[in-house]
Amino acid sequence: GEAFLMLHRNKKPNDVHEGKWIGVGGKLERGETPQECAAREIFEETGLRAKPVLKGIITFPEFTPDLDWYTYVFKVTDFEGELIECNEGTLEWVPYDQVLSKPTWEGDHTFVEWLLEDKPFFSAMFRYDGDRLLESQVDFYE
């Protein structure tokens, strides 16, 4: 069946995502496009060569005390290679019907559902206070 490759963040010290199951990702490097960043991060963390497809954008106002986070959400169905050991956590193929039962950010459950349902391109906002989701909004674009 179909599955998401998820990362159980259980290896990095002082990790804002510690203990949570999240998608693979990372920060843009200078001069890099979001697409290039996604492909690079996927390769660095998983060993897979992937062709990421942009599905949405999420804003996280004041996700850390001094920073807003702007996140590009990609979905990958076209990839090749063998999984490697990840230094940020444990990689696991999680069947679609089990993804929403994994401990993660509350907002992640929401946008993972959008990916599972193949919703149109989205622009969303999730505002947190620590681990608690305070507010969210989304626009879908046909």
Model-flagged regions — what are they?
Residues 28-51, 61-115, 136-142:
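Unchanged
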Residues 56-59:
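A structural microfeature
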Residues 25:
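A short acidic, glycine-rich active-site loop
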Residues 1-22, 49-50, 54:
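N-terminal strand-loop-strand
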Residues 117-142:
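Charged phosphate-binding loop/patch that engages nucleotide di/tri-phosphates or the phosphate backbone
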